[in-house]
Regions:
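Short loop/turn segments at strand-loop or loop-helix junctions that form parts
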Residues: 6-11, 55-58, 87-91, 145-157, ...
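Short, charged/polar "capping" segments at the starts of alpha-helices
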Residues: 13-19, 61-63, 158-159, 192-199
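Leloir-type glycosyltransferase catalytic cores
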Residues: 97-145, 254-305
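A donor-sugar binding/catalytic signature common to diverse glycosyltransferases
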Residues: 213-258
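Well-ordered, non-membrane alpha-helical segments in soluble/globular domains
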Residues: 20-27, 64-72, 164-175
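N-terminal pre-catalytic "stem/leader" segment of glycosyltransferase-like enzymes
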Residues: 1-51, 55, 157, 301-305
Length: 305
């Protein structure tokens, strides 16, 4: 049995220039450098191993042979009592469009359910990422601002857990407008604009749609609060000191966010963010760290002997 199987076939296509292929290759190189038995799997078949490494996860509905393979791998590893390591996008992607850092976890991708091996982390990784991405220091909580920003996300993926995003948007606007007269700015996801639903909520007083060319950073400028379902884009708002509201307990910002819209107009909670930020940064790794085998070493104690 292999120690590690790296599932290149968890991708829809395998191309040398593909960033995800580069990440998988770096992981494989690091494990091989430690003397582990590694299989680089490019076929649509399940291979016995202690740790199956793949890009992404599966949602409630899925199609495509590579997604079916992911599902088969997850079921096989669970049945055998072994582990899956899904690789997920960076929570700092607003400052990291090239995905220099991505996230690693065990047996699932939901931040408050699965193992990221990042509890009570030191500030070291945050300082490393902040320097590499040229991020400013975390700003004090903002106690001024005007509009409420609602950020939408792609529907149908594993993050949404089957939630109807159109319904969520309409209900969220209704709840906010029932207690607040602040302007509401809707920021659609570029890959899922939801034109009909956005048009529907634009019928409420002082509800506006973000212009297509506007960045998240620009839409957060002057915001009083920002509302998300569970998108990792909420991290950008937290770092800027903007109070955040989320609807799902598996949002990466859940521990430092509000969940009850009833206080959004006047009195959002402003919790301490320092340890949360250190822990979040600690589940991100670079390709160079992969090549050194640091991710395997970090998670080794969490794997079945």
């Amino acid at each position: 049995m292999f120690d590690v199987v790296v599932y290149f076939s968890s991708l829809p296509r395998i191309a040398d220039h593909d960033r995800k292929v580069q990440i998988l290759r770096a992981f494989s190189e690091g494990c091989k450098s430690l003397g582990l038995r590694v299989c680089d799997n490019t076929e649509l078949k399940v291979v016995d191993c202690k740790l199956a490494v793949m890009i992404g996860w599966v949602g409630q509905t899925f199609k495509g042979p590579h997604i079916h393979l992911r599902n088969d791998v997850i079921r096989h590893q669970k049945r055998k009592g072994n582990h899956v390591m899904p690789i997920d996008g960076s929570c700092f992607k607003f400052a990291d469009p090239q995905s220099m850092y991505v996230r690693y976890s065990l047996d699932g991708v939901f931040y408050n359910q699965h193992e990221y091996a990042n509890k009570n982390s030191s500030p070291d990784k945050w300082n490393q990422i902040r320097h590499a991405l040229k991020l400013p220091p975390i700003l004090p909580w903002r106690e001024t601002g005007n509009h409420i920003l609602i950020c939408l996300q792609r529907d149908g993926g594993w993050n949404m857990k089957g939630e109807d995003l159109d319904r969520w948007l309409v209900m969220t606007v209704k709840r906010i407008r029932a207690i607040s007269n602040r302007p509401i700015l809707i920021r659609p996801h570029p890959k899922r604009p939801m034109k009909d639903t956005v048009k529907k909520v634009l019928g409420f007083p002082d509800v506006y749609e973000s212009v297509k060319s506007s960045t998240l950073d620009q839409d957060l400028e002057g915001a009083w609060a920002a509302v998300f379902y569970n998108s990792s884009s909420s991290v950008a708002a937290i770092l800027k000191g903007i109070p955040v509201y989320v609807s799902d307990e598996d949002a990466v910002t859940y521990k430092v966010a509000n969940t009850d819209l009833s206080n959004i107009d006047t009195n959002p909670k402003l919790p301490d963010r320092e340890q949360w930020l250190y822990d979040l940064a600690a589940c991100h790794w670079s390709d160079e760290e992969l090549r050194q085998g640091l991710v395997w070493k970090h998670f080794k104690g969490y794997l079945k002997a």
